[in-house]
A protein has these predicted regions:
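Bacterial N-terminal signal peptides that target proteins for export
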Residues: 1-10
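Short, surface-exposed loop and linker segments with low hydrophobicity and enrichment for Pro/Ser/Thr
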Residues: 6, 98-100, 105-108, 152-160
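N-terminal signal peptide c-region/cleavage motif recognized by signal peptidases
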Residues: 17-19
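Primarily secretory-pathway and cell-envelope proteins
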Residues: 23-72, 121-180
């Protein structure tokens, strides 16, 4: 029984190490509006995915009513617009994202969020034009066991399937995706 438990623990640690090795923070700096900024790289299925975003602090504010109001477009971070760069096509639900650089927005809600992928890049985070949308995909909402004081965008992998995570406050918005 002990040997079996050790094998299971070893497998879990190996999976965690593989996921951690595939994702790394490559840059941290202060943004133009005062929030720290982070650039995360993630490699999966032969694709290199990079997300650069501002990481505002919650500071006792409420996510869905004060900072990222439910049903309204949100810059998904702070300061400059959040960018996604991929060297391979990605599929979030039925939304196909070709290789390239895009701006990410979200539409938060209490039970589900929308991921909004815009073809417009290089703008300040609040400059949004719906006619520049590549498309939208559903994000599932989960409750975090411990609140995230800062916006955190990360990737996880389970059974070879990658997932995008956006954490803030007690909310985690997630979407599995595929590389094409």
């Amino acid at each position: 029984m002990f040997v079996r438990s050790m094998k299971i623990a070893g497998a879990v640690l190996a999976l965690a190490a593989t996921t951690a090795a595939a994702q790394k923070v490559v840059a941290t700096k202060m943004g133009g509006g005062g929030s720290p900024h982070e650039t995360v790289e993630y490699s999966v299925g032969g694709a290199k995915i990079t997300i650069s975003y501002g990481r505002p602090f919650l500071k006792a504010r409420k996510v869905l009513s004060e900072v990222a109001p439910a049903g309204k477009i949100w810059r998904t971070g702070a300061d400059e617009a959040t960018t996604l760069t991929t060297d391979k096509g990605l599929m979030f639900g039925s939304l196909m994202i070709p290789a390239g650089t895009y701006t990410l927005y979200t539409v938060p809600g209490p039970t589900s969020w929308k991921l909004v992928v815009s073809k417009q890049t290089g703008q300040w985070g609040t400059a949004y034009s719906e006619d520049k949308d590549l498309g939208r995909a559903d994000l599932k909402v989960e409750t975090l066991p411990k609140p995230a004081e800062q916006v955190t965008i990360s990737f996880t992998e389970a059974g070879g399937s990658p997932t995008l995570n956006i954490d803030w406050g007690t909310t985690r918005a997630t979407s599995p995706f595929m590389v094409h």
